[in-house]
Amino acid sequence: MTTYLAGFTLGISLILAIGAQNAFVLKQGIKQHHVFLVCFLCALSDAILISLGVAGFGYLVTQFPLIETIARYAGAAFLTWYGISSLRSAFTQKHIMNPEGDASKSAWQTALICLAFTWLNPHVYLDTLVLLGSISTQYEPHKWQFAIGAVCASFAFFFSLGYGAKLLIPIFKHARSWQILEFIIGFVMLALAISLLV
């Protein structure tokens, strides 16, 4: 149980920071747009990466830095595109809360954007494959309990964030609130894109 809690605690601490993925989950939760799908894909992606890290695949990332380089540049390009889209939306679109959710993006489109936020983020490989993978070796022969704890942390966090966001819906019935959120998200995405390149 102690090993499980160590994995859970470290897992939560690594994903609590406000980043591109968390901002996207929050936005989808407020819009009530494919919330389960987004939360599930984020948590499942983490589960896959954590499992690979504990299984020893973090070694590949350290031995082949090209993996991290490709993820960094592709991630920066994606974040730049998304950031510019959010800023444009903040200044040009009319924002009205739709209680039935935003139907402008299909489940497939939403899933692809969600997966891009996860798999094109070079930090996710360092956090899951390398960091969690290497720390799990301290818990031999119970390293899979550590992994289960970290995976549970991801599921708990993303579903809490996605579904907890509905508490903010009253605030986002006003168009100005959406504009501010879009502006903040756009700024954060562009800042993260720059941070990947410098």
Each language-model region and where it sits:
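Juxtamembrane transmembrane-helix termini in multi-pass membrane transport proteins
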Residues: 2-69, 129-143
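Membrane helix-loop-helix hairpins that form the core translocation module of multi-pass transporters
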Residues: 33-103, 110, 164-167, 187
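Transmembrane alpha-helical segments of integral membrane proteins
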Residues: 51-52, 131, 155-171
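Short alpha-helical packing/oligomerization segments
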Residues: 139-156
